[in-house]
Amino acid sequence: MSLKVDCPTCGTPVEWSPLSQFRPFCSDRCRLIDLGEWFSEERSIAGEEHTPSSDTARPQLSAEDLALLEQD
């Protein structure tokens, strides 16, 4: 007996085997629809939204590092 999963896009049962070229999707079309949803941010992984603050956007340089940069 082979394992069957539902296509995440359309719900069609898909056999989970090396012969199923697009698993877990039933077709290349469903795979591309899913990829497009991730790309357009219609799908996302739940979690806190991260916005870099000005403190983390630039690395803090020591006085010694700044002096070395000024020498060049």
UniProtKB/Swiss-Prot annotation:
From the UniProt entry, list the residue stretches annotated as the region Disordered: 44-72
According to its UniProt record, what is one Pfam family this protein matches? YacG
Q: What highest taxon heads this organism's lineage?
A: Bacteria
Q: Does the keyword ATP-binding apply?
A: no
User: Keywords for this entry?
Assistant: Metal-binding, Zinc
Can you name one GO molecular function term for this protein?
zinc ion binding
Q: Does the keyword GTP-binding apply?
A: no
Q: Which cofactor does it need?
A: Zn(2+)
Amino-acid positions noted as binding Zn(2+) in the UniProt annotation, renumbered to this chain: C7, C10, C26, C30
Q: Name one GO biological process term.
A: regulation of DNA-templated transcription
> For this protein, what does the record note about how its cofactor is bound?
Binds 1 zinc ion.
> What does it do?
Inhibits all the catalytic activities of DNA gyrase by preventing its interaction with DNA. Acts by binding directly to the C-terminal domain of GyrB, which probably disrupts DNA binding by the gyrase.
Under PANTHER family, the record lists: DNA GYRASE INHIBITOR YACG
Quaternary structure (record): Interacts with GyrB.
> Can you tell me which family this protein belongs to?
Belongs to the DNA gyrase inhibitor YacG family.
Q: What is this protein called?
A: DNA gyrase inhibitor YacG
